[in-house]
Amino acid sequence: MGKIHRPRKGSLAFSPRKRAKSIVPRIRSWPKETEVRMLGFAGYKAGMTHILMIDDEPGLTNGKEIFMPVTIIETPPLRVFGIRAYRQGYLGLETAGEVIVPDFELDNYTPSKKGKGRKFTFYQFLGRRIATLPKDYTQEEFEQKLGALEDMIKEGEIVEVRALVSTQPWVIKLKKKPEVMEYAIGGTSVEEKFNYIKEKLGKEIRVGEVLKEGELLDVIAVTKGKGTQGPVKRWGIKLRAHKDSKGRRKVGSIGPWHPARVMWTVPMAGQMGFHHRTELNKRLIAIGENGKLVIDGNEIEITPKGGFPHYGIVRGDFMMIAGSVPGAIKRIIRVRPAIRPPKKKPPVQRPQITYVSVESKQ
């Protein structure tokens, strides 16, 4: 008789399979880098297309033209609006303080006909996400708080500083409410990380300033929601026999007589999708500007004929990432440099692209 080998259906590693707390994904771990840069970026998923490229990774197809499905993520510039400092606590890092920039007039928002002639400030949009923004917050108060934070760093009380950033979806005419998140900074000392954020406070950061074409990224997002699904779709259990009694898309047994209870490991119906997921080592194929990709000196519009379904036109900067990424169209997608890269890494440069499909995806 052959070896009986039947692993259980579905992974228990992601249990409980419940909805994510927030549609904005969290990054709990950061790679350690000596280069002083922001460790990641964020954008909005536009859709997928495919390209032909010369394979530059070691293997059988090296130097040959290969087909590659790619995901387009539109990345309007992020606005650095604050700095958060951490001290070492008994159970880990503790917030020691934070400083945000005072309000200022926006120069990248194009109002509708009703809003023509009006001035719009950054706090008007940030206030849609953060309800506790300070009122009558002056430049002097800002500089005073920043100086106090700098003194804490010199005294050695601070062990980590991170940048508070806001997305600017109004730049690409997607929506007005921004997403707010925190990004770690690469570097060897707290002082150089602090100086990097201090220089960027109140300014925009574009994706090309942070990430390099060809490098490996980890993609963090909330997956598409599927609602309540049965055990066959949710866990991948086997369909029961044709003449089985009392249902076909059910588990045959929910457990033994004893222990006299239903174990948590039994595949059951329930929530599927809208889960927080991280996918490792996705290659950043290319970075484009103004919705265009430059190939051999020629500008190619990345938007397919008729626009990306349910998204429309890519107007600003964008990332082209190899393969698929989790999340629905228009959903916020976060990336960071690969925290667990393979030993054989592809070269950190854009591969030679010979063709980009802009045929209709309708």
Curated annotation (Swiss-Prot):
Locate the region Disordered. 340-362
- What GO terms describe the biological role, i.e. biological process, of this protein? translation
GO cellular component terms given for this protein: cytosolic large ribosomal subunit
List the PROSITE patterns hit by this protein, alphabetically.
Answer: RIBOSOMAL_L3 (PS00474)
- Composition bias of kind Polar residues appears in 351-362
Kindly list the GO molecular function terms attached to this UniProt entry: rRNA binding; structural constituent of ribosome
Protein's job? One of the primary rRNA binding proteins, it binds directly near the 3'-end of the 23S rRNA, where it nucleates assembly of the 50S subunit.
**Quaternary structure and interacting proteins, as annotated:** Part of the 50S ribosomal subunit. Forms a cluster with proteins L14 and L24e.
Query: What HAMAP family does UniProt report for this protein, alphabetically?
Result: Ribosomal_uL3_A
Please identify the protein, giving its name as recorded.
Answer: Large ribosomal subunit protein uL3
